Curated annotation (Swiss-Prot):
Signal peptide: none annotated. Pathway: Cofactor biosynthesis; ubiquinone biosynthesis. This is Ubiquinone biosynthesis protein COQ9, mitochondrial. NCBIfam families: diverge_rpsU. It comes from Mus musculus. Homodimer. Heterodimer; two heterodimers of COQ7:COQ9 come together on the same side of the lipid pseudo-bilayer and form a curved tetramer with a hydrophobic surface suitable for membrane interaction. These two tetramers assemble into a soluble octamer with a pseudo-bilayer of lipids captured within. Interacts with COQ7; this interaction allows ubiquinone (CoQ) isoprene intermediates presentation to COQ7 and facilitates the COQ7-mediated hydroxylase step.
Length: 313
């Protein structure tokens, strides 16, 4: 009963998110990484420098209290070599750089604080910068998913431009969607050993809203570039079905030991064909719900079995 209630809650959130997407204007927004209440980044890089600075003069202290019109120049940061930098203008920019650098160390350390610390050190920062983030790896995983979605969007946008210029042939919808899902899933391959753990973290209650936002935005992008112009109930069902296909194929991929994940792509092609052959009837709505429940329940069971394993079957 608890699992059913959890799935119902997730489905409710997915439905609400699809409704929000449907009401967006044509200019589509991109989900941003949810900000956290970070400790100031200046403390990691300039604490020693501040200790050595002389006290401000009274004129300086007066100017600092005059409001935004008397803004101070941006702080200068000192890396471990003692050289000054002005690269990091805000904590969000520093966060983005650290998480991007940390992805290189995920294959060795997983979605952990150790990977983030290594990423910080690769930028010349103290490993203590990892304390800016939570200990469960959520920010790193969500950052990775956001980056992958942005890369996919760029690929689809470039292809659309080539088609519009007559330099590429427009593909059929089923082929386009299959290739789009495969392109997105292939981005997981360098991290496939640790991806079951990532999915289990994304299923934690506090991570479900941002992860669903990323999923629904991704499938909306796929349908948008596929040329979907539906304005009726099919708008919702198509995106819900594609979300279910993506999730179930992702689970198959984590257990696939065939060369180059051939079994996964065969499974994906069959699911896309099934979806495209659906009739626009009540049976389609029922199949949509079944696909989503199958994907979410399968995720819960599979992740329970896979979490902590370091080798693919």
């Amino acid at each position: 009963m608890a699992a059913t209630a959890a799935v119902s809650g997730v489905l409710g959130r997915l439905g609400w998110r699809l409704l929000q997407l449907r009401c967006l204007p044509v200019a589509r927004c991109r989900p941003a990484l949810v900000p956290r209440a970070f400790h100031t980044a200046v403390g990691f890089r300039s604490s020693e420098e501040q200790k050595q600075q002389p006290p401000h003069s009274s004129s300086q202290q007066h100017s600092e209290t005059q409001g935004p019109e008397f803004s101070r120049p941006p702080p200068r940061y000192t890396d471990q070599s003692g050289e000054e930098e002005e690269d990091y203008e805000s904590e969000e920019q520093l966060q983005h750089r650290i998480l991007t650098a940390a992805l290189e160390f995920v294959p060795a350390h997983g979605w952990t604080a150790e990977a983030i610390a290594e990423g910080a050190q690769s930028l010349g920062l103290s490993s203590a910068a990892a304390s800016m983030f939570g200990s469960d790896g959520s920010e790193l995983i969500l950052h990775f998913v956001t980056q992958c979605n942005a890369r996919l969007n760029q690929v689809l946008e470039e292809e659309q431009k080539l088609v519009q210029l007559g330099q590429a042939e427009k593909r059929k919808t089923d082929q386009f969607l299959r290739d789009a899902v495969e392109t997105r899933l292939r981005m997981l391959i360098p991290y496939i050993e640790h991806w079951p753990r990532a999915l289990s973290i994304l299923l934690l209650p506090h991570n479900i809203p941002p992860s669903l936002n990323l999923l629904t935005s991704m499938v909306d992008d796929m349908w948008h570039y596929a040329g979907d112009q539906s304005t009726d109930f099919n708008w919702y069902t198509r995106r819900a079905v594609l979300a279910g296909i993506y999730n179930t194929t992702e689970l198959v991929m984590m257990q696939d030991s065939s060369p180059d994940f051939e079994d996964t792509w065969r499974f994906l092609e069959n699911r896309i064909n099934d979806a495209m052959n659906m009739g626009h009837t009540a049976k389609q709505v029922k199949s949509t719900g079944e696909a989503l429940v199958q994907g979410l329940m399968g995720a819960a069971v599979t992740l329970k079995n896979l979490t902590g394993l370091n080798q693919r079957r």
